[in-house]
């Protein structure tokens, strides 16, 4: 295998010998030259179908825009390839031209450097008559408007468009840049009907569909004049949702009935009834702590009537009976077990107990009146006997048995008086016990023993204050007699006076 040496130097490629040759300056070095110019073209892609036997055309447009049309071979099916780009002036760069026939070498200045790229769009232009290309075009260098070979005649290159224009097609290698747009249809805005929420019960309903994607056009406009329309985030209690209001009224009625029952059963001063009602209110309101403010707002008129119940036991009983009738006439909001049981005959039972208490008080006053008359007669006899004994110092021994008999009678009267006081105290305790035992039968619920002990202690604490008020006011009992406290005070005074007489 014979290895051939590659020709690397320009002299070897041009077959130029070692002799010295003359270098000539071209017409571009003449400052008065306006007809000759040389340009260089650089393009990125050169298709294989370019016809090198024909001349290409260069068109310079505004703003240094250049269009280069290169003819293609007839077998390719596309007449030419179009390049577009811009031009830039050369600085201190020259072109050397070698003439093989004469061996002369000429140097010329380069005017512009044109850089173009293959276009991807179809362009219609006029066709031109392309003469045969010279050696410079075959080497890949496109000369300017005029090519000079030094001594021989110059050949003009057609840079314009000649006659015989026609439609020209583009190269088949041109890429298709049109993009296909897939229409997916317009976006549908599903308008969901918005209904104003009148109550939070509808908001928390599990069967109600939830609007996740809602168009802004479906949102209702806020109207300041419309009182029923509310914001979506603010629930409003209306006529449909009366659960909270009725529960508050129901709890308030329970507290009021408990306060009225304690006031009528105690039958003492305003302070005692107020303290007992407040104690009952605390016990009733302890499990319903969340509705305390609603109870206070919903039932202030009924609470204000509680201090008036303790002024008179019988008036308190009548007021309680009226309030029981009023509560019975009012329909219950709910039929389940949250409401307290109210007996229909509670007012009748209370009237019977009040009548029995009045009858027992009348019997006690009659017994106390008889005891007072006996004690007063015995005290008068004792005082007369003491006066007669002091006046007559000469009493005989026969009178001593009579004095002993009188003392014995006086002691018997005192014992009888003490027994009557014990019986009276026992009857009062029985009456109070009857009141406490009758309270559960009125349908107000059982009262705890702790409440009874505390209530009895409160009565015992405020008992002297109540006696002073009754003595100062002079209130009579319902049957026309004196109160029991005044009778007890008289009995104590009479017993003290009789004891002093015995001494």
From Swiss-Prot:
Q: Which residues carry this modification: Phosphoserine?
A: 199
Any single GO CC term annotated in Swiss-Prot or TrEMBL for this entry? nucleoplasm
For bias type Acidic residues, the affected ranges are 382-397
Q: Where in the cell is it found?
A: Nucleus
Instruction: Give me the ranges of the annotated region Disordered.
Output: 143-223, 251-503
Ranges of compositional bias, category Polar residues: 143-158, 170-189, 251-264, 297-311
Which Gene Ontology terms cover its molecular function? transcription elongation factor activity
Q: What processes in GO biological process is this protein linked to?
A: cellular response to heat; positive regulation of DNA-templated transcription; transcription elongation by RNA polymerase II
- Give start-end positions of Basic residues composition bias: 281-296
Amino acid composition bias (Low complexity), ranges on this chain: 312-326, 415-435, 484-497
Q: What does this protein do?
A: Promotes transcriptional elongation by Su(Tpl)/ELL. Essential for development.
Family, per entry: Belongs to the EAF family.
- The molecule here is called Ell-associated factor Eaf
Please name the source species.
Drosophila ananassae
Its lineage reads: Eukaryota, Metazoa, Ecdysozoa, Arthropoda, Hexapoda
């Amino acid at each position: 295998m014979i290895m051939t040496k590659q020709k690397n130097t320009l002299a070897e490629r041009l077959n130029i010998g070692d002799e010295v040759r003359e270098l000539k300056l071209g017409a571009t070095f003449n400052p008065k030259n306006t007809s000759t110019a040389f340009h260089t073209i650089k393009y990125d892609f050169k298709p294989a179908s370019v016809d090198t036997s024909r001349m290409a055309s260069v068109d310079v447009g505004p703003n240094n825009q250049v269009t280069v049309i290169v003819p293609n071979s007839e077998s390719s099916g596309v007449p030419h390839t179009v390049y577009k780009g811009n031009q830039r002036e050369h600085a201190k760069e020259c072109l050397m031209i070698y003439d093989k026939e004469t061996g002369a070498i000429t140097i010329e200045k380069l005017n512009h450097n044109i850089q173009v790229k293959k276009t991807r769009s179809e362009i219609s232009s006029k066709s031109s008559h392309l003469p045969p290309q010279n050696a410079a075009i075959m080497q890949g260098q496109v000369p300017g408007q005029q090519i000079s070979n030094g001594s021989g005649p110059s050949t003009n290159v057609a840079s314009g468009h000649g006659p015989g224009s026609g439609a020209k097609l583009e190269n088949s290698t041109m890429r298709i840049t049109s993009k296909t747009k897939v229409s997916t249809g317009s976006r549908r805005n599903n308008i969901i009907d918005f209904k104003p929420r009148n109550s939070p019960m509808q908001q928390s309903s599990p069967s109600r569909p939830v609007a996740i994607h809602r168009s802004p056009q479906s949102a209702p406009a806020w109207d300041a004049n419309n009182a029923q329309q509310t914001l979506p985030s603010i629930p409003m209690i209306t006529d449909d949702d009366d659960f909270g209001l009725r529960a508050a009224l129901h709890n308030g009625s329970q507290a009021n009935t408990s306060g009225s029952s304690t006031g009528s059963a105690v039958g003492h001063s305003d302070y005692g009834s107020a303290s007992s009602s407040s104690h009952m209110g605390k016990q009733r309101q302890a499990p319903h702590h969340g509705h305390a403010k609603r109870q206070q707002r919903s039932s202030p008129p009924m609470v204000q009537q509680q201090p008036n119940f303790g002024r008179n036991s019988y008036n308190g009983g009548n007021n309680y009976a009226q309030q029981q009738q009023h509560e019975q006439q009012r329909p219950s909001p709910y039929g389940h077990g949250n409401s307290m049981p109210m007996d229909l005959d509670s007012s009748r039972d209370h009237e019977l107990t009040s009548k029995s208490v009045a009858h027992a008080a009348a019997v006690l006053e009659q017994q106390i009146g008889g005891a007072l008359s006996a004690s007063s007669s015995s005290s008068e006899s004792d005082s007369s006997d003491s006066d007669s004994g002091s006046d007559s110092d000469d009493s005989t021994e026969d009178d001593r048995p009579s004095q002993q008999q009188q003392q014995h009678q006086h002691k018997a009267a005192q014992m009888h008086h003490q027994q009557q006081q014990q019986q009276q105290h026992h009857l009062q305790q029985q009456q109070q016990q009857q009141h406490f035992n009758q309270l559960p039968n009125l349908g107000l619920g059982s009262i705890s023993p702790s409440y009874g002990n505390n209530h009895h202690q409160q009565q015992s604490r405020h008992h002297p204050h109540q006696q002073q008020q009754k003595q100062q006011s002079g209130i009579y009992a319902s049957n026309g007699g004196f109160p029991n406290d005044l009778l007890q005070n008289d009995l104590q005074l009479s017993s003290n006076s009789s004891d002093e007489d015995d001494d």
